[in-house]
């Protein structure tokens, strides 16, 4: 959502007047804090410190955990916020971790539902991605899940992630071979 629109909506909903630039600055500050927290957690994990799992209800903890991962190439410009300069393509690795539940739709059919969704995204290669994915998997207490499903395509590196991190407890599903 553009910051100008967010500023207007905040004013409409709360009566507060906050400029778009103030909202942008707040987001930058919170983003820097979140990045510092993540780096501290990754450092602690690499030193062998235990990761505290997220508190889950008994209902969520009893559901299977799905971990799906993929990678994309994204175009970046060398000069921020302008269309100037030659595009440089960079690798982004992404994953979603979710408990696999069900719900009843309006037609009365039982359909799958992703619950307790968590995302991991890393600008960089697979080796930079693995620690962040391991951290979130530990937060989701993957080793205690009744079933873990790894879903990935045949892209390079992802099956190494599976073998290294999840083969001891997960069923692997190939969704599309490259």
What are these regions, as identified by a protein language model?
Residues 1-177:
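Catalytic center-proximal scaffold of phosphoryl-transfer enzymes
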């Amino acid at each position: 959502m553009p910051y100008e629109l967010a500023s207007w909506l905040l004013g409409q909903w709360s009566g507060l007047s906050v400029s778009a630039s103030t909202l942008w600055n707040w987001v930058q500050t919170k983003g820097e804090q979140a990045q510092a927290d993540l780096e501290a957690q990754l450092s602690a994990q690499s030193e062998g410190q235990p990761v505290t799992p997220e508190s889950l209800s008994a209902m969520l903890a009893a559901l299977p955990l799905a971990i799906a991962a993929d990678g994309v190439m994204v175009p970046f410009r060398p000069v921020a916020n302008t269309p100037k300069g030659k595009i440089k393509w960079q690798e982004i690795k992404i994953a979603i971790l979710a408990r696999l539940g069900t719900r009843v739709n309006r037609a009365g059919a039982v359909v799958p539902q992703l619950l307790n969704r968590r995302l991991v995204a890393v600008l960089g290669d697979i080796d930079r991605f693995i620690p962040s994915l391991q951290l979130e998997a530990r937060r989701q207490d993957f080793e205690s899940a009744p079933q873990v499903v790894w879903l990935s395509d045949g892209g390079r590196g992802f099956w190494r992630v599976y073998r290294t991190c999840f083969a001891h407890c997960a069923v692997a599903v190939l969704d599309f071979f490259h």
